[in-house]
From Swiss-Prot:
UniProt cross-references to CDD domains, sorted A to Z: Ribosomal_L24e_L24 (cd00472)
Name the record gives this protein: Large ribosomal subunit protein eL24
Domain of life: Archaea
Similarity annotation: Belongs to the eukaryotic ribosomal protein eL24 family.
Role description: Binds to the 23S rRNA.
Signal peptide as annotated in the record: none
GO terms under biological process: translation
Zinc fingers typed C4-type, residue spans: 7-37
Amino acid sequence: MPTTRQCSFCGHEIPPGTGLMYVRNDGTILWFCSSKCRKSMLKYHRDPKKYKWTTRYMKVR
């Protein structure tokens, strides 16, 4: 039975058969639910704690 994965950027669950697996040169495996999450992490180096649409969002105050 396929397992559900968790997005490395936003933290949402990824259903089996969807999403993208990205493998870095050091062997680290990153799972992304959308191109929005992939670009935010890899291209723009954004911090997921600063965006309300992620489950990792933390209010500063």
